[in-house]
Amino acid sequence: MKKIILTVFAATSLLLYSTPSFALFSVSVGIPMSQTITGKKSGQTYGNAPDKTSGYFLAVQLPFALGFGIDSYTTKFKTGESDGAWDKDMDTGLKTNMTNIFYQLPVPVVNLIIGLGMGTTEYDCKTRDGKGCSAYYDKGSATQWYTSIGMPLIPLFDIHLSYRSITAKNIKDKENGTKDDNSGSVTGIGIAFNF
């Protein structure tokens, strides 16, 4: 009897695990793990030096594999005397807000998502005059493409890794009109709940 129960359990697990994990409705939440900036600051041979990233990714997938999401996160810059570092007193970071549309590809076993997004980037800092970075820099527009791969742990829950490639070349210095290129990439991790 134990062998039959074990065999049925194993067969059911394999069957459920190997079927596509499309859901009628899915909610996903994630966090950024790291950001790299490959673009250059205006007039420099280097870009801003990212340090710690915090924020969130939220997404809702509809029954026909199409979904919508938002990203909101801030990456603090390194401080000190190295290239790309900012003054410690300014506590400067790059604030990113994106709105996304994505599609889940019909791939068995894993949840594979591709998407596009658009939004803004801006410097977030403290200044000695108390006005903050918005008094000295204009917000810039940003676009991204991204992909996410998720592995279902149980039929109603999966864990996923994501990669975002961001183009953000136009945070403008209000004083001299130069633009900073903060293009780069962001990696993240998240969980999805399927209903």
What residue spans do the PLM features occupy?
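Gram-negative (and chloroplast) outer-membrane scaffold detector with strong preference
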Residues: 31, 35, 56-131, 138-141, ...
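Short N-terminal segments immediately surrounding and downstream of signal-peptide cleavage
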Residues: 23-39
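Surface-exposed strand-loop-strand hairpins of Gram-negative outer-membrane beta-barrel proteins
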Residues: 34-56, 135-139, 169-171, 181
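Repetitive helical segments and hydrophobic/amphipathic motifs
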Residues: 11-12
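Hydrophobic secondary-structure block in the mid-to-C-terminal portion of proteins
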Residues: 156-195
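Bacterial N-terminal signal peptides that target proteins for export
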Residues: 1-8
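Extracytoplasmic loops and strand-loop junctions of Gram-negative outer membrane beta-barrel proteins
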Residues: 40-43, 84-86, 129-133, 174
